[in-house]
A protein has these predicted regions:
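C-terminal amphipathic alpha-helical interaction region
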Residues: 180, 195-293
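Internal glycine-rich alpha/beta core junctions
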Residues: 1-219
Length: 293
């Protein structure tokens, strides 16, 4: 290659690797969830607080217990939200590389750049939470090698470190991808949220998703402006705020995709589609906005 161009070339590889690490963590979240769900259905222990659910069994499955359900739903919500974001990024990458319109290629590349640190850091942070919670479902023997759950937790932890620690991702997001272009890329993503709100706001059942999403979008704009002004006086303000900023940005992005999924599910249910897939999507979206967002 050309002299003094190596670092730029390396970051082409690094950005791809960062998305790959996010995908690895997404897979860990999903497999941990599937294993924990299967175990929770099979493991019998005590009785439901609201009354016996399986009188023909010596105990109810631990799936009846609210905290177990919360841990499983957390993993499910993070896995499915991460999958939606990842598929969106894959579509953007295809457009960046292959779309015949140069303007579309440029805009797609800009959005990929904005979302890459979120894919890497937010999904890997979530995977750490999800795999740890899913191990917890197994109780004490989830910590031994017999089930393999402890390896998922270990694998999830390294993903927060390599290919650029998640703190580095947060600095990249706030310092370069947001403040570096005066928030232009973030505003374009905000325009997508506004389009969804305009399309779905006539559906009263969407209020529980659109209202908090809109509020967080407004707060995100406020946070960005405040941090930008403070950074002009002290560059350490960026470093101090970056990790929390990425966390908020990640929830804004996940919230957008969960609202989109809820909108589709509501439409399908209204059309008479009885596929339990749509009911499950809607219930998970409600959990995400009520407990995680």
């Amino acid at each position: 290659g050309q002299p003094n161009k190596g670092l730029a070339a390396m970051f082409v590889m690094m950005n791809a690797a960062r998305i790959g690490v996010g995908m690895q963590s997404l897979g860990l979240t999903e497999v941990a969830y599937q294993n924990a769900l299967a175990y929770a259905k099979d493991r019998l222990q005590s009785r439901s607080l609201t009354g016996v659910k399986t009188p023909n069994q010596p105990a109810d499955s631990i799936l009846v217990h609210p905290d177990v359900r919360k841990m499983l739903l957390t993993a499910k919500a993070y896995a499915e939200g991460g999958r939606a974001l990842s598929l969106h990024c894959a579509l953007l990458i295809d457009r960046e590389l292959h779309h015949p319109d140069a303007e579309v290629r440029s805009e797609s590349a800009e959005q990929v750049a904005l979302l890459t640190p979120i894919v890497k850091a937010f999904i890997t942070d979530n995977a750490w939470t999800a795999t740890s919670s899913c191990l917890q479902v197994f109780g004490g023997h989830g910590f031994i090698r017999e089930w393999g759950m402890e390896q998922y937790v270990r694998d999830a932890r390294i993903n927060m470190i390599y290919e650029g620690t998640n703190t580095i991702q947060s600095l990249d997001l706030l310092g370069r991808k947001v403040l570096g272009n005066q928030g232009a890329s973030l505003k374009k993503f905000g325009a997508q949220i506004a389009e969804l709100v305009a399309e779905a706001q006539d559906n009263e059942d969407m209020a529980e998703f659109l209202n908090p999403l809109t509020k967080l979008g407004q707060q995100m704009t406020q946070f960005t402006t405040e941090i930008g002004f403070k950074a002009l006086q002290d560059a350490d303000e960026v470093g101090a705020a970056a990790v929390d900023y990425l966390r908020v940005a990640g929830h804004l992005v996940f919230g957008y995709f969960w609202a989109r999924m809820a909108f589709v599910a509501l439409q399908k249910i209204a059309e008479g589609d009885r596929d339990p897939f749509y009911k499950a999507k809607l219930q998970t979206a409600r959990f995400y906005f009520a407990k995680l967002f």
